[in-house]
Each structure stands twice: as structure tokens, then as C-alpha cells.
């Protein structure tokens, strides 16, 4: 069972990547206008939980906005998102399948980041 989530900060935006996070993206890139898979397992109840907690959800993707909006309509998910953009927005959190966590308080953060990449990351 998922724990209750509470928003406590002024910036209550969560920026979410599209391919591989919301859209399953099982066959990789098939063209900018081709979003071919259904939603990722667990995405819909998780999006609902975030909305219920008062978060503003936006999709930030390198894919053009129009095919994402079309896909959201196809799967009746448009109501979850306050915006769809291909420009990075200020957000409290970013959910992305290719992100590397960077701890700005760690003086060795860059060293650890390079080590992670050189070791093959999450393979």
C-alpha cells in the first residue's frame, strides 16, 4: 500500500519525462510522432496519488508536444497534466529514466558522477 504524500513547499511542480516513464517505449525511438505503447505499469494510480496530494504535474520531453497530447487523449490521461512542454521547467522533482542524481552538497559529486558514467551507469 502506498503512503500518503504531502506537499509542503511553494514549488509543487513535478516534471515527468514521457518516453520510458509514462509511455512504455518498449521499441525505442520509432519517430517523433510515434508514441506506440500504452502507459507504464503503475503510472495511472501514481499520477492520481500525486494529483490528490496537490502536485502540479507537467510532462517535459524532447518529443514534440502535439503527439504527446494526442497520446494522452487516447489513454484518457490529459486531466493529470497541467502542461506538456519540451522546455525544462522549474520543478521540485524531475522524474526521468535517464537521470543521474547529483548531490550539490557533496564536494565529490562531480567525481562520483564521472565514476558512475565510466563504470557503465545502471547498465
PLM features: what roles do these ranges have?
Residues 1-123:
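HAD-like aspartate-dependent phosphatase fold
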Amino acid at each position: 500500500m502506498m503512503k500518503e504524500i504531502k506537499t509542503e513547499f511553494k514549488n509543487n511542480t513535478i516534471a515527468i519525462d514521457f518516453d520510458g516513464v509514462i509511455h512504455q517505449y518498449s521499441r525505442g525511438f520509432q519517430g517523433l510522432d510515434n508514441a506506440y505503447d500504452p502507459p507504464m505499469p503503475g503510472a495511472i494510480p501514481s499520477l492520481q496519488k500525486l494529483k490528490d496530494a496537490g502536485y502540479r504535474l507537467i510532462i517535459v520531453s524532447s518529443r514534440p508536444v502535439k503527439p504527446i497530447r494526442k497520446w494522452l487523449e487516447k489513454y484518457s490521461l490529459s486531466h493529470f497534466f497541467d502542461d506538456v512542454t519540451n522546455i525544462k521547467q522549474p520543478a521540485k522533482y524531475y522524474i526521468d529514466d535517464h537521470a543521474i542524481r547529483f548531490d550539490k552538497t557533496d564536494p565529490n559529486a562531480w567525481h562520483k558522477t564521472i565514476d558512475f558514467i565510466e563504470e557503465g551507469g545502471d547498465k
